[in-house]
Amino acid sequence: RLLHGRHRHDYNWALTSRHKRDIALDLNQAAGRDVLHQLVAQADVFIHNFRADQLERYDLTFDRLRSMNSRLIYAQLTGFGTQGPDSEKRGYDTTAWWASAGILDLMKPGVSAPMFPVGGVGDHASAMSLFGGIMMALYQREKSGLGDCVETSLVANGAWSNGMHLQGAIAGFDLGAVLEEKGYRSPFAMIYETSDHRFVVLVSPNPQKE
């Protein structure tokens, strides 16, 4: 509701959930958990974005569900992974994918504050990564007969999306210092405002070949 406000259609739900059957369950109640367990027993894939404490509370750990269905593909998408000091933090597109992976910092002009990003970009990119893991697990199941657990996180996919700059930092290349020393970005890769107040995005990294 925060995203679509008073609009008569929940267009976010329509984008990601069209043509899907749905059911609402209260997992805080034993009856709700029982229904979900019945569904899991005959499912191919179970996808969730719960933290470890929630999985324990709702009786949805990998070992528990695998005991009900040995062929189940258990897929999880978290904010900051399942191990490490941030694993129990709530993760959102803005905080984990955009901010923690350094993408927000790269997009801000000069020393100004980062702009608040649009929502859903990192969510969708990370979902495709999880989809790839699920498909590989299904392929493996055809050979082994057994399910498996696959996982990814928003921060991991943000790091991959920002991989060129992070790899540069690991190698000792400081893009910010280079831009500060030059005082400008490349004129061949820049956004220019036109006389009629529109904008042209120019990307010509190799002028000799253009």
What does each of the following model-derived ranges do?
Residues 1-146, 178:
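N-terminal helix-loop segment corresponding to the beta1-alpha1 unit
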Residues 172-210:
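Alpha-helical interface/anchor segments and their boundary "cap" residues
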Residues 12-14, 150, 190:
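Residue-level detector of beta-strand structural context in well-folded domains
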